[in-house]
């Protein structure tokens, strides 16, 4: 679930000097104590960037809040019970700043020292900047520190500052640490200013409002009158309002600014990699083309509304819609192939892995296969309204459990455009609204397939039943739509599935790896075994039901069958890796792990003693997807079928038969 590089942030590759401002809400926890974990992650990022050659300057808030918490505790332990009954006076902020500054810098020094980094403290006031000599000396000092790889840590010297509230006035040089960081960015000629906050960036409204949208690029002409600011930070001076003013000031002077969350441990590094994180302020933003993008939330709401309005029609006519779409796919095969070939060519030129390119390609006959599978689903028994269970609660009172649509589904899928067709057909047949987010490598293929499908949907249902997210919204943003999306189904790598499961409150239905095995028993028909093994590996190597591990009974070595099977695989271009026994016997590289999905013309081979050893191997290293035995001994086959713990277990059949359309079930779209 990695974020892609945003073209509008391509300038990040040229950034050398970065000023990072961290707010009080990031530095401290809710109760006012130091957020040691967050500060540790911040220092680790700064260490990494420092090692990469970046000039890093830190502006840190927090002393007043930290000092207040410490002085309150000190006052509490020195107070009598009678003292505590009296009205409590607010602590002097300047005294709080003096106490807190020491604690904050002590922590920074400790953290940086553990990382073999040296830091330096610089306290300033607004009056200091009225002196030209001060500004010149400040620049020289910082230049010397950066040359020595020292991290300058700035803060306003609140303990002796003479400025009175309100902090912002027309004559002020700066009025808080946000404006201080903007001023320093100009004085020290920074290439980028990063303002870390307790929210992910600038929203169109209060971040707590589910209808507020994160603004990725701030356009003053467009946004300044549209934004509704919520409450200020729980502990800072000005909150988001102050950050926006400081960011606009710096951006207009030519310093790009990004406001982002200080709670995510890798955000600064991700920003510098050009990822679309937080809100960017740039002097040229008003000149960038403003593309009208349909918001994913709007799509999800529209899909839900269409689904509700067309529920009865979909239940009665959903099969006919699928038959019409199947015909449309075949009628538009030529243009679909053209768009898909463009994606494949672009992926090859970009240097994508061969396994990804293989999943991306719609081979000859694939469109016809998708259309035929859609017709199979259309002719299935109606999945909605079926009575699954009936219970008599009392005399004459019957409780029925019936199947019904889930609602609006978000499907996140990688590489494979055929998945779009499979998923759309299942959604229509089951009466669900759909939001699709495909990989950028299949952009053109997904777009044409989506267009063909929605144009075949009758007007009284509407194409909004199935939405394709083509905006630059990243998956993390989609996973926040828990109020309008009912289920997330990820189809892709184990990494994608795991990341989605840990990143959303929406229920997730997803599988992990497709580590499928074929075990060839000593009783196998060798010709049948060779055909099954070749089909399982070579037919579609990138499929999740392709064979990844070949297990062979030890007795087949003496019979010479092992060499025949291996020779056939090599003839088809399959790269072989071995377990401890097979690698030595066949003189092939040893596999680094038995739990590995190649998704290409490669597989692992290993020798086992008997069917029980094969079963133990599969249950230990497999992914519970699909596993097959090739055997003429029915007793051995039945042991395998009963004891292998997988979703599909076959006897004398290729793992490639593990397909929902062939099973005439709905599961294919979700696998």
From Swiss-Prot:
Q: Which GO terms describe its biological process?
A: L-proline biosynthetic process
Q: Which reaction does it catalyse?
A: L-glutamate + ATP = L-glutamyl 5-phosphate + ADP; L-glutamate 5-semialdehyde + phosphate + NADP(+) = L-glutamyl 5-phosphate + NADPH + H(+)
Which CDD domains does the entry link to?
ALDH_F18-19_ProA-GPR
Q: Where does ATP bind?
A: 197-198, 237-243
Query: Binding of substrate: at which residues?
Result: 61, 158, 177
One example of the protein's molecular function in GO is: glutamate 5-kinase activity
Which tissues and organs express this gene's product?
Expressed at high levels in leaves and is inducible in roots subjected to salt stress.
Q: In which pathway does it act?
A: Amino-acid biosynthesis; L-proline biosynthesis; L-glutamate 5-semialdehyde from L-glutamate: step 1/2; Amino-acid biosynthesis; L-proline biosynthesis; L-glutamate 5-semialdehyde from L-glutamate: step 2/2
List every stretch annotated Gamma-glutamyl phosphate reductase. Answer: 298-671
SUPFAM superfamilies per the record? Answer: ALDH-like (SSF53720), Carbamate kinase-like (SSF53633)
Q: Which InterPro entries match?
A: AceGlu_kinase-like_sf, Ald_DH/histidinol_DH, Ald_DH_C, Ald_DH_N, Asp/Glu/Uridylate_kinase, G-glutamylP_reductase_CS, Glu/AcGlu_kinase, Glu_5kinase/COase_Synthase
**Keyword NADP recorded:** yes
Q: Where is the segment annotated Glutamate 5-kinase?
A: 1-297
E.C. number: 2.7.2.11, 1.2.1.41
Q: What does this protein do?
A: P5CS plays a key role in proline biosynthesis, leading to osmoregulation in plants.
Family per similarity comment = In the N-terminal section; belongs to the glutamate 5-kinase family. In the C-terminal section; belongs to the gamma-glutamyl phosphate reductase family.
Q: What is this protein called?
A: Delta-1-pyrroline-5-carboxylate synthase
Q: Which organism is it from?
A: Vigna aconitifolia
